Swiss-Prot record:
Topology versus the membrane: Multi-pass membrane protein
Tissue expression per record: In kidney, expressed primarily in the thick ascending limb of the loop of Henle.
Comp. bias regions, Basic and acidic residues: 919-931
Residue positions the entry lists as glycosylated: 90, 130, 261, 287, 386, 446, 468, 488, 541, 594
Regulation: In resting state, adopts an open conformation, anion-binding promoting the inactive configuration. Upon aromatic amino acid-binding, the groove in the extracellular venus flytrap module is closed, thereby inducing the formation of a novel homodimer interface between subunits. Calcium ions stabilize the active state by enhancing homodimer interactions between membrane-proximal domains to fully activate the receptor. Upon activation, the homodimer adopts an asymmetric configuration of the 7-transmembrane region that primes one protomer for G-protein coupling.
Intracellular loop 3 (ICL3), as annotated region: 790-805
Segments of this protein annotated with the region Interaction with RNF19A: 880-900
Binding positions (phosphate): 66-70, 415-417
Any Gene Ontology biological process: ossification
The protein, known as: Extracellular calcium-sensing receptor
């Protein structure tokens, strides 16, 4: 059985040796062997395997100069390690390197060789197989290049835990350690690259792109990751196509049609150079220009694509390049390559022939079967050296490698080459860790260490996973848990060299995966040259950018990147282009006209400085000065009768309340503050209640005094000055109590109202409780209504120049103002609410001030002759006569007595009319006294005295039905006209009614006189005689002051003039006694 296994292994090796001859591998012995997989050729010749004969190994074609340079980097690193005294001393590293021809099949053939040798060593069959030469196991493999190739190799090597360190396979699928257990790499995976691509598109504000990916394990995962990143950034993908170097012409044509018809100008390509080359050739043939190609690192510097004849199509490409490294001495090592000197490198012979287009085999004739290209994979490059079919000359061996420009000597940027160099050193440092391991500190069971002389592949894999060393550039090298080596990218831009017309790769930025999100990408836009040699960033959006002040609106049925620009609504703004939504302005701000920003809202209130506020302030100040002026006048003329008659103390309090009313209006002007809001309504309410309470007490007092028939002690007691102030206090205290409850439970406060108008903030007062405000105003209106009732009832009383009448007018004005205030207050808003209330307060205050005080001030200042006690008493007397006459004539049943001298016949009550007519000129210097016939009935209490004849001796005319008499009273003249119409006395007596009466009296400024007077009226008819006789005078109703104390300062004129006079009116055979109360 052992012999059988040995023979199978030998057969596998023999078959592999036939497939890979000496010229198709590089091999060198050593204590430890490293395997290598490099794409020395770009592909294999297509053959139709019809299986009619034994299948032959496929032939590799199209030489890859960069692939050979990567192989040289591995050899250089191994030789440098072998010569190092500090790294793996006393040990030699060997290598076995094979050409993968950039295909999975060739790579698996080479991998099978590594696995088979390791299997033979693990079986220890040398003694049975009788092998002539022992070949050590391959403890690690460097490679492969493409992700698709590495995926196939990793599946096979993973079965035997042989570590694989790739230098160019970046597919993120290879990070799956459950499937690829032994895979590691010195290149970042495509996850970071896909993120970087999305960041670049977002940076240039593109949102409409197309994607193309290689149909393998490199392109599909890479473009899938890009889609995820693009979706997070609202980047839309117009088309997504897969390509391959093996795609037929029809498939390529379809992809080109899609690209040509698409409106996307940016195309993201995750592919290698060989897979992309057929597509680019067709695009060049069709001359499709104006596209921006975003290249992954696999073809970002590929010479297959970066050809001068393609520049009008691919010029301006933005790509990712791996971080370039430095390998000291590597350039000289590359220049030393020679077929005769590189005995361990079977690929050197073909490299020499392809470089100098010659052949080393003497006598070789005939055309070469294939064209010779210079081409690279993933780092790329393609140059046609010779497509001629002529005979190649013999190589002399003296050719100079520096005389020919090939990608092999492109030493400017060592990216993949440096990754190869780093992969070799990673394996060497893992071996070094094994070599220097101390028992008890190892990575294996119980801290044991591996034997460096018998080291196995899985032990090397263990140490690679825990690797940590510093490279020649001073950077820390370590593999993460996924076996990846995190690195950065360079951003390159394709330019056309002005020197030789070739395409050069200019570094225009970088991508730092270690930086925090948002700061990873840096691009210098000034260095970028776009397609068509333009410096302006191309446009690749489904819709035009929405300018500031607008937002993107979704179009139904279209991708989210295809939108229409919608203007931001009022109150919202967008300060940047392509805003997905408009931002709402803060509460105190509003959008400007273009909706590009927010501006502070206009703050509006009834300000002191605005014309309306100034006008109201002036009116309020005017009211305050007028009130103060009136108060000053009253204080100065406090001892005059008209001031005394108004109850000085109560008038002072009333004027003070009016001052408060005018002043309270000022709290409604200016910016509302919490304290002004809490003060203005109570100040207004309390001031008006105080004012109305004073008026109410004055009005009610006058009414009660004039309605009283006989003054009693009740009036003197309850209408004293102290009680009047007490009533004012009680009425005002109720309002104060309402305000205290209001301020305690729900105090008003300033409020910034944003809802009334969009662009204006109205600073107003929030009243806190509408119920409390209603109670305050309601109580004020209730007192005003009561005051109006009493004032209206006493409007005809003569007290103090018809003060009750003016109070009635003032209350009427008060109600008109506040009734008008209610709809105006409800229909206004903002600052006009305060203005309406100020106007109402001022109007009501001016009405009260004018109606109650202006007439008195006018008399005091301009009519001092009327500011006398006599004037006051004369008005009282006139009122008394009118009351007496009306009371007599309206009495329904009159006691009729006839004088014995006139006979006992029953008289009838004539239809009479009494009128009074004032005549200031008709006066007599001295009244004439005549004996008149005594009245039929006299008041028994009055003193006996001779009646005063009030008219001169007149000639009687008995035939006249009407007589007129002039009655002289003091210095005034009163004319009474009494007419009688009694054609039938009996009929008139039965009618018992009066037809008409009138009385006109003129008051004079002379002394009214304080005496009893008999006022007889005699006509020609003896039966028609009417006599008015004052029968008594009673003293003041209130207080202890006597009527004679006229000059006393302490005496109230209103109280002095309050008297009760008793009159007997007789005539026509009847008499009536009437008590008249007048003031």
């Amino acid at each position: 059985m052992a012999s059988y296994s040995c023979c199978l292994a030998l057969l596998a090796l023999a078959w592999h040796s036939s497939a890979y001859g000496p010229d198709q591998r590089a091999q060198k012995k050593g204590d430890i062997i490293l395997g290598g997989l490099f794409p020395i050729h770009f592909g294999v010749a297509a053959k139709d395997q019809d299986l009619k004969s034994r299948p032959e190994s496929v032939e590799c074609i199209r030489y890859n100069f960069r692939g050979f340079r990567w192989l040289q980097a591995m050899i250089f690193a191994i030789e440098e390690i072998n010569s190092s005294p500090s790294l793996l001393p006393n040990m030699t590293l060997g290598y076995r390197i094979f050409d993968t021809c950039n295909t999975v099949s060739k790579a698996l053939e080479a991998t099978l060789s590594f696995v088979a040798q390791n299997k033979i060593d693990s079986l220890n069959l040398d003694e049975f197989c009788n092998c002539s030469e022992h070949i050590p196991s391959t403890i690690a493999v460097v490679g492969a290049t493409g992700s698709g190739v590495s995926t196939a190799v990793a599946n096979l090597l993973g079965l035997f835990y042989i570590p694989q360190v790739s230098y160019a396979s970046s597919s993120r699928l290879l990070s799956n350690k459950n499937q690829y257990k032994s895979f590691l790499r010195t290149i970042p995976n495509d996850e970071h690259q896909a993120t970087a691509m999305a960041d670049i598109i977002e940076y240039f504000r593109w949102n409409w792109v197309g994607t193309i990916a290689a149909d393998d394990d490199y392109g599909r995962p890479g473009i899938e990751k890009f889609r995820e990143e693009a979706e997070e950034r609202d980047i839309c993908i117009d088309f997504s196509e897969l390509i391959s170097q093996y795609s037929d012409e029809e498939e390529i044509q379809q992809v080109v049609e899609v690209i040509q018809n698409s409106t996307a100008k940016v195309i993201v390509v995750f592919s290698s150079g060989p897979d992309l080359e057929p597509l680019i050739k067709e695009i060049v043939r069709r001359n499709i220009t104006g596209r921006i190609w975003l290249a992954s690192e696999a073809w970002a510097s590929s010479s297959l694509i970066a050809m001068p004849e393609y520049f009008h199509v691919v010029g301006g490409t933005i790509g990712f390049g791996l971080k370039a490294g430095q390998i000291p001495g590597f350039r000289e090592f590359l220049q030393k390559v020679h077929p005769r000197k590189s005995v361990h490198n079977g690929f050197a012979k073909e490299f020499w022939e392809e470089t100098f287009n010659c052949h080393l085999q003497e006598g070789a004739k005939g055309p070469l079967p294939v064209d010779t290209f210079v081409r690279s994979h993933e780092e790329g490059g393609n140059r046609l050296l010779n497509s001629s079919t002529a005979f190649r000359p013999l190589c002399t061996g003296d050719e100079n490698i520096n005389s020919v420009e090939t990608p092999y000597m492109d030493y400017e940027h060592l990216r993949i080459s440096y990754n190869v160099y780093l992969a070799v050193y990673s394996i060497a440092h893992a071996l070094q860790d094994i070599y220097t391991c101390l028992p008890g500190r190892g990575l294996f069971t119980n801290g044991s260490c591996a034997d460096i002389k018998k080291v196995e592949a899985w032990q090397v894999l263990k140490h690679l996973r825990h690797l940590n060393f510093t490279n020649n550039m001073g950077e820390q090298v370590t593999f993460d848990e996924c076996g990846d080596l995190v690195g950065n990218y360079s951003i390159i831009n394709w330019h056309l060299s002005p020197e030789d017309g070739s395409i050069v790769f200019k570094e225009v930025g970088y991508y730092n995966v270690y930086a925090k999100k948002g700061e990873r990408l840096f691009i210098n836009e000034e260095k970028i040259l776009w397609s068509g040699f333009s410096r302006e960033v191309p446009f690749s959006n489904c819709s035009r950018d929405c300018q500031a002040g607008t937002r993107k609106g979704i179009i139904e049925g279209e991708p989210t990147c295809c939108f229409e620009c919608v203007e931001c609504p009022d109150g919202e703004y967008s300060g940047e282009t392509d805003a997905s939504a408009c931002d709402k302005c803060p509460d105190d701000f509003w959008s400007n006209e273009n909706h590009t920003s927010c501006i502070a809202k206009e703050i509006e209130f009834l300000a002191w400085t605005e014309p309306f506020g100034i006008a109201l302030t002036l009116f309020a100040v005017l009211g305050i000065f007028l009130t103060a002026f009136v108060l000053g006048v009253f204080i100065k003329f406090r001892n005059t009768p008209i001031v005394k008659a108004t109850n000085r103390e109560l008038s002072y309090l009333l004027l003070f309340s009016l001052l408060c009313c005018f002043s309270s209006s000022l709290f409604f002007i200016g910016e509302p503050q919490d304290w002004t809001c809490r003060l203005r309504q109570p100040a207004f309410g309390i001031s008006f209640v105080l004012c109305i309470s004073c008026i109410l007490v004055k009005t009610n007092r006058v009414l009660l005094v004039f309605e009283a028939k006989i003054p009693t002690s009740f009036h003197r007691k309850w209408w004293g000055l102290n009680l009047q102030f007490l009533l004012v206090f009680l009425c005002t205290f109720m309002q104060i109590l309402i305000c205290i409850i209001w301020l305690y439970t729900a105090p008003p406060s300033s409020y910034r109202n944003h809802e009334l108008e969009d662009e204006i903030i109205f600073i107003t007062c929030h009243e806190g409780s509408l119920m409390a405000l209603g109670s305050l105003i309601g109580y004020t209106c209730l007192l005003a209504a009561i005051c109006f009732f009493f004032a209206f009832k006493s409007r005809k009383l003569p007290e103090n120049f018809n003060e009750a009448k003016f109070i009635t007018f003032s209350m009427l004005i008060f109600f008109i103002v506040w009734i008008s205030f209610i709809p105006a207050y409800a229909s206004t808003y903002g600052k006009f609410v305060s203005a309406v209330e100020v106007i109402a307060i001022l109007a009501a205050s001016f009405g009260l001030l004018a109606c109650i005080f202006f007439n008195k001030v006018y008399i005091i200042l301009f009519k001092p002759s009327r500011n006398t006690i006599e004037e006051v008493r004369s008005s009282t007397a006139a009122h008394a006569f009118k009351v007496a006459a009306r009371a007599t004539l309206r009495r329904p049943n009159i006691s009729r007595k006839r004088s014995s001298s006139l006979g006992g016949s029953t008289g009838s009550i004539p239809s009479s009319s009494i009128s009074s007519k004032s005549n200031s000129e008709d006066r007599f210097p001295q009244p004439e006294r005549q004996k008149q016939q005594q009245p039929l009935s006299l008041t028994q209490q009055e003193q006996q005295q001779q009646p005063l004849t009030l008219h001169p001796q007149q000639q009687q005319q008995p035939q006249q039905p009407r007589c007129k008499q002039k009655v002289i009273f003091g210095s005034g003249t009163v004319t009474f006209s009494l007419s009688f119409d009694e054609p039938q006395k009996n009929a008139m007596a039965h009618r018992n009614s009066m037809r008409q009466n009138s009385l006109e009296a003129q008051r004079s400024n002379d002394t009214l006189g304080r005496h009893q007077a008999l006022l007889p009226l005699q006509c020609a008819d003896a039966d028609s005689e009417m006599t008015i006789q004052e029968t008594g005078l009673q003293g003041p109703m209130v207080g202890d002051h006597q009527p004679e104390m006229e000059s006393s300062d302490e005496m109230s004129p209103a109280l002095v003039m309050s008297t009760s006079r008793s009159f007997v009116i007789s005539g026509g055979g009847s008499s009536v006694t009437e008590n008249v109360l007048h003031s």
